[in-house]
């Protein structure tokens, strides 16, 4: 059963502007949103880990009527670089808000100083923080309609949280939808047989796992979203290209696993070698717009 929200018509119309102009080769955006955008609040602390402050940027819709859907943005950077302002995330944050969805671009601890599960724990902490009554009231968000949008390394983190979440959408660590651009979902030694991963990708994953090689890497399976798939997982939108940094076989395996347990999934495959935010051409933006409308704006709350 689906329930409709008072804001649906407004959000569907305004989401026509969502994600426009977010190519990965665009100049690094400034941390300041356009003057006509909704409120932007930078460097909000959502937690502390290992003595370090964990920060996020909030981009809030202007003139929202009622509680809005929200998306947590998770940057890429090979796990050892990047920030909440990195790789087009600032622009994407503002554009989501302009389309009527609250967006929160998060920092997380980086490798090699911190290995898995530090990154997953940090983003999960941001999710749980946003669901606290104080933040729900302050940001005007619906805690049951929070999704994740991850790019590259961020897509690995998003996929992990999406498949491992438990509890209710009100107060647990489950999410309502996942957008994953170029995710690697099987980080085990056998997972390397899926396609032909580049040396750069392998090095980044090993650093994330805190391992020197895959033969003795106890974190590898636990960090692999593929092995955590079950019927309670949220709908996934997976975008990849045929010859990119992450083998297409990784995305295909994830899509097959999700479909096998009845979880809605879109696998959007592009030609060429585009990776992560480079995938955001007009067709992909339009498809993601529709996905977010269906899964965060107009969808009913899941009870399984």
Where are these regions (language model features)?
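Bacterial N-terminal signal peptides that target proteins for export
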Residues: 1-9
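Alpha/beta-hydrolase superfamily serine-hydrolase fold, recognizing
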Residues: 24-304
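Hydrophobic helical h-region of N-terminal Sec-dependent signal peptides
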Residues: 10-15
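C-terminal motif of bacterial Sec signal peptides marking the signal peptidase cleavage site
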Residues: 18-21
């Amino acid at each position: 059963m689906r329930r409709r929200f008072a804001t649906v018509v407004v959000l569907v119309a305004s989401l026509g502007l969502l994600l426009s102009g977010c190519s990965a080769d665009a100049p690094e955006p400034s941390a300041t949103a356009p003057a006509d955008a909704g409120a932007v609040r930078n460097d909000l602390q959502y937690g502390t880990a290992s003595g370090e402050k964990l920060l996020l940027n909030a981009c809030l819709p202007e003139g929202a009527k009622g509680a809005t859907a929200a998306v947590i943005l998770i940057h890429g950077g090979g796990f050892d670089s990047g920030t909440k302002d990195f790789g087009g995330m600032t622009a994407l944050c503002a554009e989501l808000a302009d389309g009527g969805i609250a967006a929160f671009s998060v920092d997380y601890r980086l490798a090699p100083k911190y290995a898995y599960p530090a990154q997953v724990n940090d983003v999960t902490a941001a999710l749980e923080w946003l669901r606290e009554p104080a933040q729900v009231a302050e940001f005007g968000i619906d805690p049951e309609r929070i999704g994740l949008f991850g790019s590259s390394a961020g897509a690995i983190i998003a996929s992990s949280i999406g498949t491992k979440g438990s509890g209710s959408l009100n107060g647990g660590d489950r999410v309502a939808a996942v957008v994953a651009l170029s995710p690697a979902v099987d980080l085990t030694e056998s997972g390397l047989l899926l396609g032909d991963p580049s040396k750069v990708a392998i090095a980044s994953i090993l650093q994330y796992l805190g391992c020197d090689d895959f033969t003795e890497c106890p974190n590898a399976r636990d960090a692999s979203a593929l092995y955590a798939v079950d019927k309670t997982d949220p709908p996934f939108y997976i975008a990849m290209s045929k010859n990119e940094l992450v083998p297409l076989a990784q995305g295909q395996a994830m899509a097959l696993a999700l479909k096998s347990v009845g979880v809605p999934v879109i696998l959007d495959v592009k030609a060429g070698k585009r990776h992560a935010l480079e995938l955001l051409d007009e067709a992909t933006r339009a498809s993601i717009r529709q996905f977010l409308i269906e899964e965060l704006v107009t969808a009913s709350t899941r009870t399984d």
